[in-house]
Structure formats: C-alpha cells, structure tokens
C-alpha cells in the first residue's frame, strides 16, 4: 500500500496555505493595490519610462524663412531597472499548540506572515525603510523631499496646523506642474482628521465622503485616498510604524509613475527538521512555516520638457505643522 511520506505531507501543507499567504500579502501591501504591478520573469528587468516630452511648433508658409520649416523634436525613454529582492519571515509554533487549537493556526500563521511582508514592502516604498540598495529609485518621500516639493500643514480659522485640506491642494498643485496627481496617501488616522475638517461656519468640508476607485479608501479633492497602518521591524528587533508621522502627514503622487515588480516564485515552505533562530524544531517538537516573496520598485521621475533637462518628482509631501 502506498504511503504518504514526510516530503509529500510538507508539499500538501505548502500548497494548502500558499493562497492564504498570497491573499494576505495583497491585502496588506497597499502599494500593490495602488500602483501598477509588473510580473517579473527574472530577477532584473529593464523598463522603458518616458523621460522627455516633445514640443510642437507653429509653421509658417514661407519657402525661405526658418519659420516655414517643420521642426524636429524627440521623445526619449530612460531605462528604469526593476531588481527583485527577497522579503522573508519564519514563524515557528509548538506541535502541542497546533493539536490543542480549535482554529486553523497554520492558516493564521500564513495570514500573519503575509501581512508582515506586505507592511515591510509598504515601508520601503513609502519612506525607504530598510530599502534594498539595489533599488536605485528613491522612496516616495525621499523623491519629494529632494525635489523640494514639500508643504507644511498651515493654519485654518485661527487653529494652528489645522489646514490639512489646503495643504493637500498645494501639494497636488506642485505635482501637477509636470505630472498628473491621482492619489493621496496617509496614515490610518488621517481619514478621521479629514472627516473632521470644518469650514468657517463649522460645517464638514467633506460631506458626504466621496467614493473613490476600486482599491482606494475614498476620495478627497479628486484624489483617491489610501491609508496605511501597522508596524515593521525597526532594525533592532523592535517596532517602527509603516507610516512615519514624524516626517509626513500625507503624500500626493501620480500613480502612473510608480511600478511595483513581483516575482512569481512567492513561496510557503513547511519546516519540521530545521534549526530556526537557535531552536532545533525536532528537539522541541515544533514546526514552522517559512514565507518568502521577491519584490522590486521603480519611480519614473525627472521628466524633461522639450530639450531642457529637468529634475522633478511625481510626488509631493505634506509635513506636520512646525509650530509658530
């Protein structure tokens, strides 16, 4: 009679929980739902990104004057390199805990593993938190800051630091000089701060809260809103927030200029014979699930107008009120 060996059982477990893991990554990593996603077949992929807009000119009817010559212009594309780097986490659990549980703890571990990877991806794209050195593009915050596209929250109706609505419009205007602002990104509590914005008569500015496009959390001033929450590793085995409220209250971005790369070899692996973090799983009657995903990121900035080189960003940041 054929039997099921250890390898077969591990494969079945990995297959059973891969979908749970993938769903959790997609749900938690807001950047995957917000920006275009490119499925990578290799570790490194070069993408052509528009870097120069051509200019047209009026042409006269003269057969001899320069104004009668149709002008030439060029549209150029720059290579942006996507380099897939690995995010991984291993979650061990005691076999007795699994045996005594009334819930599917392996499924819960898969959800937790996916969420931790999703948050780490968000933090790297937003603020460059532990961003791989092979990702040549600046994080969204760094791009806006280096381009000088920064707006501090101003005052409203005599209340210091209350004009977040006006600051969002100023930031969107900065992006709109060259790009098409489409999304407002912020920390989770920003949705309530925006809902509490009042005009001079005490009436809510955003009533009703407008419905955004699928994948967004609503709409403010024509911008689809996406809110981020949760914590990531701070580099010292502690916690750091995904959204750094000390440096940014919100970010305005042209989503079409951001690309998230995803390698298709996202995996779940069942472990019962390994040594993890100094713990011998077999000796301790423990098992573990190892979760791995490979992601890349690129930002299409510095679009030139005509023949003039330029430094600009499709991102603007709203910083906290600095005080009087």
What are these regions (language model features)?
Residues 2-89:
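Assembly/oligomerization interface modules of large self-assembling protein complexes
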Residues 41, 142, 146-287, 293:
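Extended oligomerization regions of viral-like shell subunits
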Residues 48-51, 94, 187-189, 292-294, ...:
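Structured loops at beta-to-helix junctions and adjacent beta-edge loops in soluble globular domains
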Residues 53-56, 88, 97, 119, ...:
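Short loop/turn segments at secondary-structure transitions that flank enzyme active sites
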């Amino acid at each position: 009679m054929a039997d099921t060996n250890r390898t077969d059982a591990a494969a079945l477990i990995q297959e059973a929980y891969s979908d749970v893991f993938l769903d959790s990554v997609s749900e938690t990593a807001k950047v995957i739902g917000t920006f275009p996603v490119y499925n990578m077949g290799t570790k490194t992929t070069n993408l052509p990104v528009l870097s120069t807009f051509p200019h047209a000119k009026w042409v006269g009817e003269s057969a001899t004057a320069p104004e009668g010559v149709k002008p030439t212009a060029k549209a150029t594309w720059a290579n942006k390199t996507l380099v897939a780097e690995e995010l991984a986490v291993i979650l061990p659990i005691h076999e007795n805990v699994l045996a005594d549980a009334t819930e599917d703890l392996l499924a819960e571990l898969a959800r937790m593993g996916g969420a931790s990877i999703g948050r780490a991806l968000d933090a790297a794209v937003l603020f460059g938190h532990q961003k791989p050195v092979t990702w040549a593009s600046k994080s969204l915050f760094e791009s806006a800051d280096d381009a000088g596209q920064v707006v501090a929250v101003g005052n409203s109706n005599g209340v210091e630091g209350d004009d977040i609505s006006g600051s969002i419009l100023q930031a969107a205007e900065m992006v709109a000089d060259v790009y098409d602002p489409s999304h407002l990104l912020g920390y989770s509590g920003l949705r309530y701060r925006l809902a509490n914005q009042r005009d001079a008569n005490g009436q809510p500015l955003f009533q009703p809260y407008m419905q955004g496009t699928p994948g967004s959390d609503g709409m403010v001033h024509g911008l689809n809103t996406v809110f981020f929450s949760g914590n990531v590793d701070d580099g010292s085995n502690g916690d750091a927030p995904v959204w750094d409220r000390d440096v940014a209250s919100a970010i305005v971005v042209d989503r079409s200029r951001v690309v998230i790369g995803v390698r298709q070899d996202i995996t779940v692996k069942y472990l019962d014979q390994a040594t993890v973090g100094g713990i011998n799983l077999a000796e301790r009657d423990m098992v573990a699930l190892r979760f791995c995903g490979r992601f890349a990121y690129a930002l299409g900035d510095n679009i030139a107008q005509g023949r003039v080189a330029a430094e600009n960003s499709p991102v603007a940041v709203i910083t906290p009120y600095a005080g009087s």
